[in-house]
Swiss-Prot record:
The record marks 99-100 as: Reactive bond for trypsin. Belongs to the protease inhibitor I3 (leguminous Kunitz-type inhibitor) family. PANTHER family: KUNITZ TRYPSIN INHIBITOR 2 (PTHR33107), SERINE PROTEASE INHIBITOR 5 (PTHR33107:SF38). Inhibitor of cathepsin D (aspartic protease). May also inhibit trypsin and chymotrypsin (serine proteases). Protects the plant by inhibiting proteases of invading organisms. Residues 24-32 form a propeptide. This is Aspartic protease inhibitor 7.
Amino acid sequence: MMKCLFLLCLCLFPILVFSSTFTSQNPINLPSESPVPKRVLDTNGKKLNPNSSYRIISTFWGALGGDVYLGKSPNSDAPCPDGVFRYNSDVGPSGTPVRFIPLSGANIFEDQLLNIQFNIPTVKLCGSYTIWKVGNINAHLRTMLLETGGTIGQADSSYFKIVKSSKFGYNLLYCPLTRHFLCPFCRDDNFCAKVGVVIQNGKRRLALVNENPLDVLFQEV
């Protein structure tokens, strides 16, 4: 009996030594529970600050460029400028500064729900006409246009995300938390839609798109 136990120990000893050597020199890296969120950066490589103002600029120059600005929507009866546009070139006026207001926390991360607000002096009447939202479907353009008149913390029409572009810079997404059926463009796994550009009365208007999202950068003011 003792002889059998001795032989068994001799057989198991190399396996134990190999296992110890393998795990110490070649540790098994198990995947983490969730990826570490990345902070959104401005054109200087600084982390975006909810208390700072930024211009949303294009990643392209010349006729392909152009900053985002607040303008009057065609045929609108709103008492204040209520459209989110992009200049037709980066040569000319600068865009309207915005600030980003995260749903929670004091930092701005990629793929995080937030509100976007034009950060400009305004009269009391126009206070709500600085907060971005997505309007109803425009039958002529067959899309949903970005406009102002939103509400901070409003779940259905005023929440956006900043995500890394597959090309360069960042993309903006519109992400309603509820009533997804009201957004036929919100087709990804998170019920978000890409923000791009359409032409409205000769102007570049920000709108929801299926392809060619707008690649942007954030320049601190």
